Design a protein with these regions (language model features):
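N-terminal amphipathic alpha-helix/helix-capping segment at the start of soluble metabolic enzymes
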Residues: 2-56, 90-103
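Alpha/beta enzyme core
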Residues: 46, 51-53, 59-114, 118-198
């Protein structure tokens, strides 16, 4: 039985002090659940709300890429300077130590390689939510092709990944791909980033 001695002060609930309502510094994420906020907090700096992401997922469409031939040698020395690493599950598992204190964004889609003129056709899910959870991913990245023939399919993949990620508290990142024949203009990027945010 609990000791009754000294428990008279246990009824002081400080009703005159309001409960702290802590805001959340990542824009648009104040309504998210605990798991989602926890993962976002690992990626974004609390003072600036910004993040430095180092992406090395190029090999999944480009094959061997100059400067990234030995990811196990070139990426780990850069980790102290970044907030988030983005790569495919295979590269992250084989080249990045799970003991590294850095957020991980896993590329979860596949797309056509650079061997095809139209790279926006033929994409799909390469890493499902179970694999993302098993890897303790802080974010899932989906390639999108705004203004290309595969736009609709890529946005469908983004929406379904966001639905699944929300269910498990894992944020989804929409990555904007600029097609070979598309101009890299401010107007294009304003349109593309707004579409992905919506």
């Amino acid at each position: 039985m609990a000791d009754n001695i000294g428990n008279k002060a246990a009824h002081d609930y400080h009703l005159d002090v309001p409960v702290a309502q802590e805001g959340f510094y990542v824009k648009g994420a104040a309504h998210c659940d605990y798991g989602m906020k926890s993962r976002l907090a690992r990626m974004f700096h609390p003072k600036s709300g910004n993040a430095v992401m180092l992406a090395f997922d190029h090999g999944y469409i480009m094959g061997p890429t100059a400067g990234l031939e030995r990811i196990d040698l070139v990426i780990p020395p850069l980790i102290p300077y970044v907030d988030v690493l983005m790569g495919t599950r295979g590269v992250i598992r084989s080249c990045i130590s799970p003991a590294q204190r850095v957020a991980r964004c896993v590329r979860v889609t596949y797309d056509a390689t650079v061997l095809f003129d139209e790279m926006s056709n033929g994409g799909g899910i390469a890493c499902d939510i179970e694999n993302a959870v098993r890897m303790n991913a802080d974010c899932m990245a989906v390639q999108t092709f705004i203004g290309a023939p595969g736009e609709s399919r890529s946005l469908e993949l983004l929406a379904r990944t966001a639905d699944t990620g929300t269910r498990y508290g894992i944020p989804t990142l929409g990555v904007v791909a600029v097609g070979k024949d598309m101009e890299r203009t401010e107007k294009f990027f304003l349109l593309a980033t707004r579409v992905l945010a919506e």
